[in-house]
């Protein structure tokens, strides 16, 4: 894609090349280039300058180029009008390499929840079960217990001996599970009851002491993650079946009202602050110290999911109008959409930020596609992750090495991310 130059003169353009990645910096002097220069030609220019400077990375790295903070030169993007009289400042960044398909984890029913932790993948399904897999694709456990589809899963803790995780279901309960890694056995140690309709989303806080759930009953509830008795459950931990039969239950630490329709997504900003999305067209930020709503962002469409990034402080949302939207909760103009991302052709069901790259997020939609985005490129995703044969219901990027997605084709697709923590290959 070429820069479009407006003005009487044609032919040459004065360009300053800048980068925030100091290891790839070139001399800060104006360069004279053709007005219709392409991304490929700019890559040759930058790599030639790096080679002339004796940079060992010269020729090994491909770059993308940004004008006014957005990618103007990539495929599918519209041309920008640039005045010939101006010296153009063009930022270049290392191009994110394409994720590679690694595995397809086949389940017995729709996969509606997925979350990775270290080398393990936890999934929740419409056949009411949870499943544990290794990131190499080996199935370890099928876990029955719920009596309706599982809509959310979250890891609480994991070490070499024991794992603790929770699941949220349309059966109105949240179950807290303890997994003996060596014996590969799992036990439901707490059943959390209090919601009056199906539970649609769940998330644990950063210190893993509490978890939050959102439901079709419009309520946000906060629970203890302590596997021991307490939080409303005074009975010693027994087997899952005994607990269900006897009706013993952990009660919530807190119930917060404010939404008018289903709470579709919940994330912790810090241990005292949460953000939720809802079908009622609002995003609400909650302060647990105040026991209520701190602020609110209103949209004109239902929100099916949201993701909050601790790296950049921004919120990305998924909606049924096929679009993703970016919000800054700290902005005085927080109700205004900072950007809208176009590319899906059906409802967008799920969205997740990268936990190690402040610019990247993934989305999954009813068009069977998972897309990888750079928030500086709103007109098109940087990659499409192909594989699902039916609707994508959930996606996850908790482990920076793997992008995961679950769908109504009964599968979890595993894509290996080339760049992990700190640019590690």
Curated annotation (Swiss-Prot):
Ubiquitin-like (UBL) domain, as annotated region: 13-94
Keyword Repeat (UniProt): yes
Pfam family, one: WD40
Descriptive protein name: Ribosome biogenesis protein WDR12 homolog
Cellular location(s): Nucleus, Nucleolus; Nucleus, Nucleoplasm
Function: Required for maturation of ribosomal RNAs and formation of the large ribosomal subunit.
UniProt repeat feature WD, residue ranges: 106-143, 145-187, 194-233, 258-296, 298-337, 343-383, 387-425
CDD domains: WD40 (cd00200)
Family (UniProt): Belongs to the WD repeat WDR12/YTM1 family.
Primary localization: nucleus
One example GO MF annotation: ribonucleoprotein complex binding
Organism ancestry: Eukaryota, Metazoa, Ecdysozoa, Arthropoda, Hexapoda
Disulfide bridges in this chain: none
Keywords linked to the UniProt accession: Nucleus, Repeat, Ribosome biogenesis, rRNA processing, WD repeat
Annotated stretches, region: Disordered: 227-247
Highest taxon of source: Eukaryota
GO BP, sorted A to Z: maturation of 5.8S rRNA from tricistronic rRNA transcript (SSU-rRNA, 5.8S rRNA, LSU-rRNA); maturation of LSU-rRNA from tricistronic rRNA transcript (SSU-rRNA, 5.8S rRNA, LSU-rRNA)
InterPro entries: G-protein_beta_WD-40_rep, NLE, WD40/YVTN_repeat-like_dom_sf, WD40_repeat_CS, WD40_repeat_dom_sf, WD40_rpt, WDR12/Ytm1
Coiled-coil blocks: none
Keyword NADP set for record: no
GO cellular component terms given for this protein: nucleoplasm; PeBoW complex; preribosome, large subunit precursor
């Amino acid at each position: 894609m070429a820069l479009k130059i407006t003005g009487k003169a044609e032919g040459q353009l004065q360009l300053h090349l800048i980068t925030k990645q100091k290891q790839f910096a070139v001399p800060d002097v104006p360069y004279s280039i053709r007005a219709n220069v392409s991304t490929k030609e700019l890559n040759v220019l930058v790599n030639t300058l790096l080679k002339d400077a004796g940079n060992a990375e010269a020729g090994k790295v491909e770059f993308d180029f940004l004008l006014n903070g957005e990618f103007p030169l990539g495929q599918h993007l519209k041309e920008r009008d640039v005045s010939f009289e101006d010296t153009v400042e063009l930022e270049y960044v290392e191009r994110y390499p394409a994720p590679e398909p690694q595995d397809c984890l086949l389940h017995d029913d729709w996969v509606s929840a997925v979350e990775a932790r270290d080398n393990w993948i936890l999934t929740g399904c419409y056949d009411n079960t949870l499943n544990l897999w290794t990131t190499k694709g080996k199935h370890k456990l099928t876990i029955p217990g719920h009596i309706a589809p599982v809509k959310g899963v979250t890891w609480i803790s994991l070490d070499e001996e024991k794992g603790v995780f929770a699941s949220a279901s349309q059966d109105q309960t949240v179950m807290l599970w303890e997994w003996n890694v060596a014996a590969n056995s799992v036990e439901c140690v707490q059943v959390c009851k209090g919601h009056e309709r199906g539970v649609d989303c769940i998330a644990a806080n950063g210190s893993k002491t509490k978890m939050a759930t959102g439901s079709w009953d419009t309520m946000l509830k906060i629970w203890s993650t302590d596997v021991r008795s307490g939080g409303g459950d005074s009975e010693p931990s027994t087997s899952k079946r005994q607990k269900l039969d006897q009706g013993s239950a952990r009660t919530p630490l807190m119930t917060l009202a404010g939404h008018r329709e289903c709470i579709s997504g919940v994330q912790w900003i810090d241990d005292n602050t949460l953000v939720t999305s809802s079908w009622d067209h609002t995003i609400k930020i909650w302060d647990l110290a105040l026991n209520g709503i701190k602020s609110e962002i209103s949209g004109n469409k239902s929100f099916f999911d949201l993701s909050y990034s601790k790296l950049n402080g921004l919120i990305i949302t998924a909606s049924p109008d096929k679009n993703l939207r970016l919000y800054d909760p700290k902005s005085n103009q927080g109700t205004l959409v900072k950007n809208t991302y176009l590319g899906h052709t059906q409802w967008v069901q799920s969205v997740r930020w990268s936990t190690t790259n402040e610019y990247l997020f993934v989305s999954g939609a009813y068009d069977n596609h998972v897309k990888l985005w750079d928030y500086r490129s709103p007109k098109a995703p940087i990659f499409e992750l192909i594989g699902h044969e039916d609707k994508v219901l959930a996606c996850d990027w908790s482990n920076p090495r793997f992008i995961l997605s679950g769908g109504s084709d009964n599968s979890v697709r595993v894509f290996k991310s080339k760049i992990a923590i700190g640019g590690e290959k």
